[in-house]
Amino acid sequence: MPAFSLNAYVALSAVLFALGGIGVLVRRSPLAILMCIELMLNAANLLFVAFGRAHGGYEGQIMAFLVITVAAAEVAIGLALTVLLFRRRAEVDVDRVNELKL
């Protein structure tokens, strides 16, 4: 099975990152924003692993593992804040939340 070239991985990663960035800017639901941030982080993971494979080292996989760990913490904190926001205000629209004090 032939492997894809590094350019294909870079292009796919750029497209995924751009889609995630557009989703963060356009969406108003905190859950959708979290999913788009996860898409952006996975695009970075793909790029790390692709460059690591192209250069024959394990550094890309180590960085991808680190990003996955940070993403798990980000999701846990983001979901906790979303649940807290919903309990306090009975809505989760990020446009209506303009102050940090709940």
UniProtKB/Swiss-Prot annotation:
Main location class: membrane
Highest taxon of the lineage: Bacteria
UniProt-listed Enzyme Commission number(s): 7.1.1.-
Pfam families linked to this entry: Oxidored_q2
A Gene Ontology BP annotation from the UniProt entry: ATP synthesis coupled electron transport
Transmembrane regions listed in the UniProt entry: 6-26, 31-51, 65-85
Alphabetized InterPro entries for the sequence: NADH_UbQ_OxRdtase_chain4L/K (IPR001133), NUOK/Mnh_C1-like (IPR039428)
Membrane topology of this protein: Multi-pass membrane protein
Reactions this protein catalyses: a quinone + NADH + 5 H(+)(in) = a quinol + NAD(+) + 4 H(+)(out)
Location(s), subcellular: Cell membrane
GO molecular function, one term: NADH:ubiquinone reductase (non-electrogenic) activity
GO CC annotation: NADH dehydrogenase complex; plasma membrane
Disulfide bridges in this chain: none
Keywords: Cell membrane, Membrane, NAD, Quinone, Translocase, Transmembrane, Transmembrane helix, Transport
NCBIfam families in the cross-refs: PRK05715.1-2, PRK05715.1-3
Function (record text): NDH-1 shuttles electrons from NADH, via FMN and iron-sulfur (Fe-S) centers, to quinones in the respiratory chain. The immediate electron acceptor for the enzyme in this species is believed to be a menaquinone. Couples the redox reaction to proton translocation (for every two electrons transferred, four hydrogen ions are translocated across the cytoplasmic membrane), and thus conserves the redox energy in a proton gradient.
Subunit structure and binding partners: NDH-1 is composed of 14 different subunits. Subunits NuoA, H, J, K, L, M, N constitute the membrane sector of the complex.
HAMAP family found in the cross-reference section: NDH1_NuoK (MF_01456)
PANTHER family, per database record: NADH DEHYDROGENASE SUBUNIT 4L-RELATED, NADH-UBIQUINONE OXIDOREDUCTASE SUBUNIT ND4L
Recorded family membership: Belongs to the complex I subunit 4L family.
Protein name per the record: NADH-quinone oxidoreductase subunit K 1
Protein encoded by which gene: nuoK1
